[in-house]
């Protein structure tokens, strides 16, 4: 029995706290209050238009579903802005099925920030520690220490996450802050549209009346002379006004072809923070945190397997986790390495490597000289290391069995086949062997990447 609007909202909050991650709940749900409930419509007040728009876009259906479960019938949700917010003098409900026009103060694309891209969900490791610290410093004191801040790194390494985390952090401190997140492609498209409509003045006011400007994929500005010209003046206007500029690219400014020298100079005059691919421990931590936020229980060996299989970027890593979880959910099988391996194997991209790298990795990791790997010693530790090396060489090279035998001192191809089958069987039945192979695979991947031109 629902005694009041406050009682219903309290029950909804209790359930949402279990359904959503803690940062999401505390940032977007806990700050809202209830205004009324007439038996059919529940009106919820948010502290500002930004929060209202966010709930409307991402959590309205979840709230409605929870309310329906509690009340026992469909409940319509209306979102309103609390009295006094954004200098308003009244509560203004947002009509169902219609998103209210964004107020001028919120028209900057801060409202397009991904709610998951916050600092609390970013896993810090040796590969990104400097970039994370720089972004946090910028978020706390924009326009001071590192301006501009230039983030560079490969695809899927977390540049966009860090950029948008800066925006979220500033909006938590000051909901009225004008945060502008935009891709270089969007900047170019807006510029072209402004030229066609003869509205350059409006374009410039739009892009220059911001507190923090976050520009993604700035490398795509290369060769676009007029875009570079306009961006140069936009950058200067913001920088001279003490406004923070954060740029992200897949390469440092000096390596962006056909970039004007003056832009290259300005992009480089702040801090350039490089983000590298995460190491094995960081990848495992990323998977663990992702699983915790999604309320997924993962055995450690599964985390190790996925982390060792996907080494290039975080996007692929999380995609593999999603595929594994989806398969287990649909099939009803237990979450084990054996069950998820067939689902992930077709898309696991092993790096083609050389026999020399594999011999070196196995020798160093197992403390067995390469001469012994190629020799005929039957000592248990040497024989096992040799078999592991043969297995890995079959996995990571295109060599035939006879060719692999030649790499190990002229062994017969039947010996290679026996060794590969034995190690494969041990991988399925012996957790220690599985862990060893994942560690060696990770080392091979890293060693192979370091030798790429």
UniProtKB/Swiss-Prot annotation:
Gene3D superfamilies attached to this UniProt entry: 1.10.1750.10, 1.10.8.60, 3.30.300.180, P-loop containing nucleotide triphosphate hydrolases
Record remark on domains: Domain I is involved in oligomerization and binding regulators, domain II is flexibile and of varying length in different bacteria, domain III forms the AAA+ region, while domain IV binds dsDNA.
Protein's recorded name: Chromosomal replication initiator protein DnaA
Record: residues binding ATP: 156, 158-160
Keywords carried by this UniProt record: ATP-binding, Cytoplasm, DNA replication, DNA-binding, Lipid-binding, Nucleotide-binding
Renumbered residue ranges of the record's region Domain IV, binds dsDNA: 329-453
Subunit: Oligomerizes as a right-handed, spiral filament on DNA at oriC.
Homology family: Belongs to the DnaA family.
InterPro entries named among the record's database cross-references: AAA+_ATPase (IPR003593), Chromosome_initiator_DnaA (IPR001957), Chromosome_initiator_DnaA-like (IPR020591), Chromosome_initiator_DnaA_CS (IPR018312), DnaA_C (IPR013159), DnaA_dom (IPR013317), DnaA_N_dom (IPR024633), DnaA_N_sf (IPR038454)
Pfam families documented for this protein: Bac_DnaA (PF00308), Bac_DnaA_C (PF08299), DnaA_N (PF11638)
UniProt-listed PANTHER family: CHROMOSOMAL REPLICATION INITIATOR PROTEIN DNAA (PTHR30050:SF2)
Positions of region (Domain I, interacts with DnaA modulators): 1-73
């Amino acid at each position: 029995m629902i005694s009041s609007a406050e009682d219903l909202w309290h029950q909804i909050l209790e359930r949402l706290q279990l359904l959503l991650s803690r940062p999401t709940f505390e940032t977007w749900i806990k700050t809202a209050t209830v205004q009324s409930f007439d038996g059919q419509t529940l009106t919820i007040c948010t502290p500002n238009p930004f929060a209202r728009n966010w709930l409307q876009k991402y959590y309205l259906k979840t709230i409605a579903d929870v309310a329906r479960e509690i009340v026992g019938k469909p409940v319509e949700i209306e979102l309103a802005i609390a009295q006094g917010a954004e200098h308003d003098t009244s509560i203004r409900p947002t009509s169902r099925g219609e998103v209210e026009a964004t107020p001028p103060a919120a028209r900057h694309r801060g409202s397009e920030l991904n709610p998951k891209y916050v600092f609390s969900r970013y896993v810090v490791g040796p590969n990104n520690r400097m970039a994370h610290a720089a972004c946090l410093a910028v978020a706390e004191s924009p326009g001071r220490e590192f301006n501009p801040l230039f983030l560079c790194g490969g695809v899927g390494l977390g540049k966009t996450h860090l950029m948008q985390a800066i925006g979220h952090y500033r909006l938590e401190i000051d909901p009225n802050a004008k945060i502008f997140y935009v891709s270089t492609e969007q900047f170019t498209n807006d510029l072209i549209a402004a030229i066609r409509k003869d509205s350059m003045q409006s374009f410039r006011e739009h892009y220059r009346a911001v507190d923090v400007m976050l520009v993604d994929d700035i490398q795509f500005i290369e060769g676009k002379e007029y875009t570079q010209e306009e961006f140069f003046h936009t950058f200067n206007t913001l920088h001279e006004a003490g406004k923070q500029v954060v740029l992200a690219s897949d390469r440092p400014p000096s390596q962006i072809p056909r970039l004007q020298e003056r832009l290259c100079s300005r992009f480089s005059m702040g801090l350039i923070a490089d983000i590298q691919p995460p190491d094995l421990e960081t990848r495992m931590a990323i998977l663990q945190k992702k699983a915790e936020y999604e309320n997924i229980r993962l055995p450690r060996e599964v985390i190790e397997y996925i982390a060792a299989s996907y080494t290039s970027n975080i996007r692929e890593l999380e995609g593999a986790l999603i595929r594994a979880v989806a398969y287990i959910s649909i099939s009803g099988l237990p979450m084990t390495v054996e069950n998820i391996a067939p689902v992930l194997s077709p898309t696991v991209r092993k790096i083609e490597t050389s026999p020399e790298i594999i011999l070196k990795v196995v020798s160093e990791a197992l403390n067995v000289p390469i001469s012994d790997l190629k020799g005929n010693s039957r000592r248990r530790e040497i024989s096992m290391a040799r078999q592991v090396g043969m297995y890995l060489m079959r996995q990571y090279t295109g060599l035939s069995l006879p060719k692999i035998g030649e790499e190990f001192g002229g062994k017969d191809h039947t010996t290679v086949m026996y060794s590969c089958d034995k190690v494969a069987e041990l991988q399925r039945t012996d957790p220690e062997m599985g862990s060893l192979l994942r560690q060696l695979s990770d080392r091979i991947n890293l060693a192979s990447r370091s030798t790429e031109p």
